[in-house]
Structures are given as structure tokens and as C-alpha cells.
Amino acid sequence: MKRSGPFFHDVSQENLYLKSELSRCHKLISELEASYFHQKNNKLLKENTDMKEKLQQLSAELTHMSTKEKHASHTSQTLHQIRAELLDKIVVLQELLSAETYKRRAEIEEKHKLHIAKVKIEEENKNLHKRISELQASIEQEQNALLQAKQQAELIKAENGRLKEQMVEKEYQLKHIKIEVDHMKDRIIETKERLLDIEKTKEKLFHETIISYKRQLDESDAWIASHFADIDGGTKQKEKTEEEAPAAYAQPNHVETILEDVTKQIHVLQKQLAHAQSSDQAKSHTIEELKNRAAEEKPYQKWVYKLNLEKENKPSQKKPQ
């Protein structure tokens, strides 16, 4: 009777079950061949030999009795009795032969049934071997696919680590550039304040120069008026005027020198301001490029991290920081 195997979720357990069933069938066949057929055949051979010996013995007795009948002078009653006994023995022998024939037929039918069962078991064994081979090939394919998935997961993990390192480096560079931009903005503000102070100083010096020119003109007018009013005291006044005139002309020259220095400093500061603004624009452009690049790289990093988690057992939805 064919046994139905249990339902297994694991292929290895199913293989073990099929192998155990196959071994059990082989063992059953071996036991049947070793115990039943061999012993029964020996028994039948022995019984057949015994029956032949009995038949030969009865034949010898019959021959002996026939000889006795020819040579002896027995009565007809004794002869009939002997014949009746012989007939009874022959009937018994025929019954034994019929029973033996029936047994042999039954044994032949049983052997035929066992042979059919053996053929079925061998066919089932072939199917089981074929099924085991298919399962083994499927297991090898699954193992190869699993190995490839693990290798791909390792590559993705390494790529994820590399991208994280790049992001850390880019963030550090961006932070450093922001610090430099802040310093540059502070320097620009400081330069603007210095320019404003210089403009104020220039206006103040210009105002003081105009006042000084006005005061000198007033003094010159007063001096000319007093000169024409007092021509007689010309010698002393002339000497005094000659002494004061260089001093009056020297002061405007000193003011012009100061104004030229201030103008040069203003030009230098303007150049520094223009250079700082140009550098600020370049760094702002660099910062924008880094921000755009970071915005482009972050979705790729998120996708790689999610793909790495999907290769694990039931991953949770997690975003990289």
C-alpha cells in the first residue's frame, strides 16, 4: 500500500523523507526475497522430494504386492483388500498432489503479485530519484542566486559607504567655504566702514582746506589793504609779508599731499573691495554648485541604502541621514 508523504515547506526535509521511504522500500524487497521466497521454495522442494519418495515407495509396494500376488496363493479377499488399500493410498496421493498443485499456483500468483509490486516500487524509485535530482538542481540554482544577491548586496554596501564618505567630505568642504564666505563678508563690511570713514575724513579735510583758503584770502585782503594804506612802513611790512607768504603757501601744499595720500588709499581699498566682491561671487557660485551636486547625490544615496535594506529579512523603511 502506497503511503502519502507529509507536506514539507523545506526542500531538505522533503529530500530526507523521500530518501528514507526509498530505503524502506529497498529493505522491504530484500526481506521479502530473503525470507519468504527462499524459505518457501526450500519447503516446497522438500515436500516435493518427500512426495516423490512416497510415490516411489508406493509404486515399489504395488510392484511387490503384484509380485506377491503372482507368486503367492492368497485368497481373493486378501487381494481385494490389498488393492483397496492401494487405491486408497493412490487417492490420498492424488489429493496431496492436488493440494500441492493448488499451493504452487497460489505461490506463483503471490510471486507474480510481488513481482508487480516490485516493478511498481522500482518505478517509484526512479521517479523519486528524478524528483531528488530536480530538487537538487533547484537548490543549487537558489544557492547560486543567493550568492549573487549577497555579492551584489556587498557591492551596494561598499558603494553606500563610499557615497557617505563623499557626503561627509562635501559637507566639510561646504562648511569650510561657508566659514570663509562669512570671514570675507566681515572683511567686506569692515572695508566698507573704512571707506565710509575715509570719505568722511576726506570731506572733513576738504572742508577744513576751504576754510583755510578762505581765511588766507581774508588775511591776504587785509594785508593788501594795510599795505596800500601804509606805504611808508613798507620795508618792515614787506619783510613780514615775505616771511608769512611761504607759510601761507606751504599749508595748502601740505593739505594737497594729504588729499593725494587719502585718494591713493581710497583707490587701494576700492580695488580690495572689488577683489573681495569678485571672490565672494566665485565662492557663492561654488557653494551653489556644491549644493546642487549634493541635492543630486542624496537621492542616489537614499536609493542605494533602501536597496541594501531590501536584501535583508523584512527591512524597515529607513532614510539615510
From Swiss-Prot:
Residues in coiled coil: 37-70, 108-205
Top-rank taxon: Bacteria
GO terms, biological process: sporulation resulting in formation of a cellular spore
Signal peptide: none
Composition-biased stretches (Basic and acidic residues): 234-243, 282-293
Induction details: Transcription starts around hour 2 of sporulation and requires sigma-E.
Disordered: annotated span: 234-253, 274-293
UniProt KW keywords: Coiled coil, Sporulation
Protein's UniProt keywords contain Phosphoprotein: no
Protein name stated in the entry: Sporulation protein cse15
Organism: Bacillus subtilis (strain 168)
